[in-house]
Every structure is written in structure tokens, then in C-alpha cells.
Regions:
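Transmembrane alpha-helices and immediately adjacent membrane-cytoplasm interface residues
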Residues: 2-24
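Short coil turns that delineate tetratricopeptide repeat
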Residues: 64, 97-98, 132, 166
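Alpha-solenoid helical repeat scaffolds
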Residues: 68-72, 88, 101-106, 122, ...
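TPR-repeat structural position
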Residues: 49-50, 83, 117, 151
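Alpha-helical segment of the N-proximal tetratricopeptide repeat
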Residues: 29-65, 72, 76
Length: 167
């Protein structure tokens, strides 16, 4: 009876081995992806574009979290001067309600760097529509509208900035 119990446990263990290995592999893959994401964010913060792009690519391979990896990839591309890639990633972020605000803010910044205030204003307005209390979006709208002399649109944005305690 003891031998039969031992054989039963051994067979059950062998049958469960593939699923255990699969879970372990998936967990390790996710852990490695989160590490790549963290290292990529640190590289962006440190101003290291090559490392940021390398870690962003690694995180995209390992994680099924396009919001996070697209944001990192957009920042890394922007940092390395690849505005076309950054625009693609920021545009991708605009397609999801959870990340649309960040996508539009990123597109506004890219447009400002390309000296395209019209596109920047459109993106900043969209960001402000998504988050009406955002001082960042309101500040961009306020400045761009003021530069156009459109005070009736700049003043409401100024109110948002002032309520947020920004100067």
C-alpha cells in the first residue's frame, strides 16, 4: 500500500511538472520584463538614450503590457532624437483611454520641438479635454493660445493652472 501511494504521488508529480514549469517560466519572463522596464525608466531619467531603447525593446519582448512598454519606447525614442518613432509610440498611446492623455501630451511636446504650434495646440487641447484639471496641459494651451493672441481661450486655461497652484 505504501509503494502504491508512492507511485501515485510520483505519477501525479510528473503529470503536473509541465504546468509547473510553464508557470515558473512565465513568472520569470514577467519578472525579467519588469526589470527591463525599470532599467529603461532609469535610463530615460539619467539621459541614456541607447540603454533606454535597449531596455524598452527588451521589455516589449518580455511583457504583454503595451501601455507601459509603448510609453517607455516613446520616451526612449524621443531621448535619442528619433521623433518619428516617438510620434508612432505616442500616437499608439492616444488610442487607449487609459494612456490617451500621455500620448497627446507627448505629441504636443514633439510638435513644439518641430516648431509646429498648431499641431501642439490641438494635441494639448485634446489632453486638457481628457483631464480638465491638468496643469501641464492647461499651461501648454495657455501659452500657445496667448502666443496666438487668443486671450478668450488662454484665460480659462490660466484658471486651471492657478487652481493647481502653478505659476
Amino acid at each position: 500500500a505504501l509503494l502504491l501511494l508512492f507511485v501515485d504521488r510520483l505519477l501525479r508529480g510528473l503529470l503536473q511538472l509541465p504546468s509547473w514549469l510553464g508557470r515558473n517560466l512565465a513568472r520569470r519572463r514577467t519578472d525579467s520584463g519588469h526589470r527591463a522596464l525599470a532599467l529603461g525608466l532609469m535610463a530615460v531619467s539619467a539621459g541614456e538614450p541607447d540603454e533606454a531603447r535597449r531596455q524598452a525593446a527588451r521589455a516589449q519582448r518580455l511583457l504583454s503590457a503595451p501601455h507601459l512598454t509603448d510609453l517607455l519606447s516613446a520616451q526612449a525614442a524621443h531621448l535619442s532624437g528619433d521623433h518619428n518613432a516617438a510620434a508612432r509610440y505616442f500616437t499608439s498611446l492616444t488610442r487607449d483611454s487609459d494612456t490617451a492623455f500621455l500620448g497627446h501630451i507627448g505629441l504636443a511636446r514633439l510638435a513644439l520641438e518641430k516648431d509646429d504650434p498648431g499641431t501642439a495646440l490641438t494635441a494639448a487641447r485634446t489632453a486638457l479635454d481628457i483631464r480638465p484639471k491638468s496643469a501641464l496641459a492647461a499651461r501648454q494651451v495657455m501659452i500657445l493660445e496667448a502666443e496666438r493672441g487668443n486671450w478668450s481661450a488662454a484665460l480659462p486655461a490660466l484658471s486651471v493652472v492657478m487652481r493647481a497652484g502653478e505659476q
